Amino acid sequence: MKQLFLIIGAPGSGKTTDAELISKNNSETIAHFSTGDLLRAESAKKTERGLLIEKFTSQGELVPLEIVVETILSAIKSSSKRIILIDGYPRSVEQMQALDKELNAQNEVILKSVIEVEVSENTAKERVLGRSRGADDNEKVFHNRMRVFLDPLAEIQNFYKAKHLHKVINGERSIEEIVHEMQEYILSFGN
């Protein structure tokens, strides 16, 4: 059975970089998928779905639920790796509930933990506005993305805490410290 770890955090928390490094360090057993990268790749294809995704992401809004869930599940099932890291998911209560429902309806994948990389809003803002990745990285859109992240956060945290799946990692440290702690935690689950 595949082990799934969801990695959440504010825009600029470092969740994608952390997950990339962990999967690179453990390439035999760990696959990493960034929800954002999966959606950007689909958007770049300029298909009907891609254009729809672009319409939402360019405004900092959430992509429709069915498109995101379909994209996530496809990535998990197509992977040959035993441990799957997905960052940037869930970003809404609806996404959380939809994934929970899908995972409960199958026996190929088990959710082991939801890891939250916690950073202050100031740190997130400095990191996002200091990088240039596309049209979505300006101050107005950053604030919208923070709102989209923060609005459902307490409910998402409480849902996973009740299932004893929520883990917080301090994202205000060096990348080496964060990756080390997260990697040790993930690998502690064994088989």
Swiss-Prot record:
Principal location class: cytoplasm
Binding site for ATP: 12-17, 131, 173
Key words, A-Z: ATP-binding, Cytoplasm, Kinase, Nucleotide biosynthesis, Nucleotide-binding, Transferase
Location relative to the cell: Cytoplasm
CDD domains: ADK (cd01428)
One Pfam family, short name: ADK
InterPro entries, sorted: Adenylat/UMP-CMP_kin, Adenylat_kinase_CS, P-loop_NTPase
GO-annotated molecular function: adenylate kinase activity; ATP binding
Top-level EC class: transferase
Region feature (LID): 130-136
Substrates-to-products reaction catalysed: AMP + ATP = 2 ADP
Keyword set includes Glycosyltransferase: no
Documented EC number(s): 2.7.4.3
BP GO terms, sorted: AMP salvage
Ligand binding (AMP): 35, 40, 61-63, 88-91, 95, 133, 145
HAMAP family in the cross-refs: Adenylate_kinase_Adk
Record text on subunit structure and interactions: Monomer.
Family of the protein in this entry: Belongs to the adenylate kinase family.
Domain notes for this protein: Consists of three domains, a large central CORE domain and two small peripheral domains, NMPbind and LID, which undergo movements during catalysis. The LID domain closes over the site of phosphoryl transfer upon ATP binding. Assembling and dissambling the active center during each catalytic cycle provides an effective means to prevent ATP hydrolysis.
PANTHER family attached to this UniProt entry: NUCLEOTIDE KINASE
Free-text function comment from the UniProt entry: Catalyzes the reversible transfer of the terminal phosphate group between ATP and AMP. Plays an important role in cellular energy homeostasis and in adenine nucleotide metabolism.
The name this protein goes by in its record: Adenylate kinase
Organism, scientific name: Helicobacter pylori (strain HPAG1)
